[in-house]
Each structure stands twice: as C-alpha cells, then as structure tokens.
UniProtKB/Swiss-Prot annotation:
Single GO cellular component term: plasma membrane
Name of one Pfam family that matches: MFS_1
Gene that produces this protein: norB
Source organism of this protein record: Staphylococcus aureus (strain MSSA476)
Signal peptide: none
Record-given protein name: Quinolone resistance protein NorB
Function: Multidrug efflux pump that acts independently of NorA and is one of the factors that confers resistance against diverse quinolones and chemical compounds.
Subcellular location: Cell membrane
Source species, domain of life: Bacteria
Amino acid sequence: MEKPSREAFEGNNKLLIGIVLSVITFWLFAQSLVNVVPILEDSFNTDIGTVNIAVSITALFSGMFVVGAGGLADKYGRIKLTNIGIILNILGSLLIIISNIPLLLIIGRLIQGLSAACIMPATLSIIKSYYIGKDRQRALSYWSIGSWGGSGVCSFFGGAVATLLGWRWIFILSIIISLIALFLIKGTPETKSKSISLNKFDIKGLVLLVIMLLSLNILITKGSELGVSSLLFITLLAITIGSFSLFIVLEKRATNPLIDFKLFKNKAYTGATASNFLLNGVAGTLIVANTFVQRGLGYSSLQAGSLSITYLVMVLIMIRVGEKLLQTLGCKKPMLIGTGVLIVGECLISLTFLPEILYVICCIIGYLFFGLGLGIYATPSTDTAIANAPLEKVGVAAGIYKMASALGGAFGVALSGAVYAIVSNMTNIYTGAMIALWLNAGMGILSFVIILLLVPKQNDTQL
C-alpha cells in the first residue's frame, strides 16, 4: 500500500492515541516515582538525597533541552523526533530496571528527561500540522489530558503498581506503552518546517545552561551532606554563579539565543512564565506528602497515592472551567483565584501535627483544593503567555514557557526533598514535612504576588 503524502494526510484517532501514549510515558510513568521514594531508598540501598536527584533529574533534563529539541523537530522532522523520544524512553526504562545500581537509576532517569524533551514539542507540532479546526481543539484537549491527567494520576498510579506488582513494573508497563505508541505512529508522513532558519543553534548557551542547572541541582540535593564549608560545595557554588553570569551575558549578545530575554520586557508574559515556574514547583508537595505518610504514618505507597485522587479529579474537571473563566473574566482573576485556592490546599496538607484521622481528612480536602487551583490557573496562564508574544516569536515563547514548567517541577521536587531531609534529621519527620510543605505554600504566595503585580486586568497588551 502506498504511503500517503503529507498534503493528503489528515490526523486520525490512531495517530492521536499514539501521541497521547507517547506523552504519558513522561507525565504518568516517569513522574510516578514521586510516590515510591522510600521503596527506592531500600531497593537501591541509598540515601534520600541520591533518590531525590533521580526523581528530579528527569524534569530537569526535559526543561533544559525542550527548546533545542523543538528546533530539531522543525528541522529534521517531528515524526522522527517523536520516535527518537519514544526509543529513548525505552532505553532509559531498561537501565532503571536491570540493576540495583544507583548510577544506572540516575542515568536512566536522565535519558527519560531527554525523551520527554523530544516528545513534547514534536507531538504538539504534529497536532498543529495534521489536525484542523475542531479536530485540532479536540486533539489538543486529549494532549492536555495526557499531560495534566498523567501528572494528576501519577502519584496514585505509582503507588498502586509498586504495591501490587513491584516498582519495576512501572517501567515495564512504560516500555509496553512505548512500543504500542511506535506502532500507532508508524506510517504517518513526515512533517517539517517549510522555512528552516539559517541561524546556528545556540550550543554555547545550552552548554552553560546544563552546567549551571546540574551544579545547582547537586547543591540543593547534596548540599547538607557535602557541608557548606567543603571545597566541593564552594566549587559547585562558584560554577553555578559563574555559568549563570556568563549565560546572561552571552544570551543578550547572541543573534539566535536559546532564551530570548527580550520577551521578558512584556510584564504579562513575565508574570505568566514566572508564576508558571513557581506553581510547577509545588510538585514538591507530592514527594514530601507521600514520603511522610509512608515513613511517618506507616502507609503503603498505594494508600499514600489514594489520598491524592481528589487532585486528579479536580484538575481534569477544572481545566475546562478555567477556560470558561478566561473567556468571561479575562486572564488575571482566574490566575489569582486558582493560585489562592492552591495555597489553601497547601496549608491543609502541611498540618502534619494533627492526629492521623484528622490529617487524612485535611489531606483529601487539601488535594482537592490543590487540583482545583491548578486546573483554574492552567489555561489562563498559557493563554496569557502565548497571547503576549509577538507572532514571529510564538514558538520560542511557548518553548520558554514549557521550559519554565519542567524546570519548576524539577527544582520544586529537589528543593522540597532536600528541606524535608535536612529538617527531619535536625528534628523529626513531622516537622520536616511541615516545613517542606510550607516552602511549597511560600512558592504559591510568591506566585500570587507576581500575578498581582505583573499580569494586566485585560490581556490586550502585546509586545
């Protein structure tokens, strides 16, 4: 049978299912480790700092490379890069499950981050190329369900699989899903950008960004173990500050920068992107709360994950509600309402000093508010970021916005896990969890202030 040409091909359900399955390899499977930290500590015979690196490094590498991967997809083909991303996920999953060596766990998670960086921009571009009008809106809705829904259910899913089958089955299932995705996407005509930019990719900027973020991640996760006066700590701190300073200088001079800082001259875009970074940072709530109820209350990973089911339900319901609020109230009010509700949820989840039954009730209600808030915030924030970017820079602006999402999640998990470990060692796990969760509430409050100050009442100010 002759393969259909790009011009003749129309997106169908087979391709869409393949796209959604490829998306959940990151948002559902890779992210589900937030609920199996104690199990991984025992399985790999390692400390919580090493496990925190393994958990956070996937989102970290996804965030670092997502903009560059989007450019590669445009140049060499979106189908090709999606397939490469799926194959990388299979490779990363295999490295994670074949041994009990912590180094292979970290390398496997790193490769999964590269996989997500390839899959996310490439699949969005495929949808834009092959789905039109209402079909495109439908496809984007399913893509969002795969990402937001996957992140909502990942805690429960990880706990359920780890308890019933063993944690390695998370990645065995991920490999199976990846193979199905490859089969469903096979036969789709390649799609590339018609106008390839002649500008060279900003390799120097990418290298400096990788050095800076890796150094910072190690400082956060291993800082207390290294000691602030140790030579390695001071060296890593100097590398972080030096690479960050050099990155800023070079990016401002570059003709085709990795991060175009001119975009941040627009207050609305800055407010949406900065608040997005911080609210993705509250993903640290999941790793702290799940670890606490397992270590402190003796719950299984399945029981711990069950507490967050209200989060999953509410975030899926409220995404469409947030869209309607955006249409009637503009962008600022829904973003403020969503963030405010999320802060209330964070505060409820942080009440670790309560008796067990009362704390469980607070957790269930807290996760409900958590999902409700994120669901209301999501669409208005994305719309604000995209609407306030000039037409010729929409792709770059969207890439930076997604980079903020991934890096926010990575550092939120790393920082929350580090604070939990440090304070728990100094006091007890109840206080450690409470302080770490207060940190997440603080990020929510800072996000609220940024939205209040930077996002205009009417989203009509363009660059």
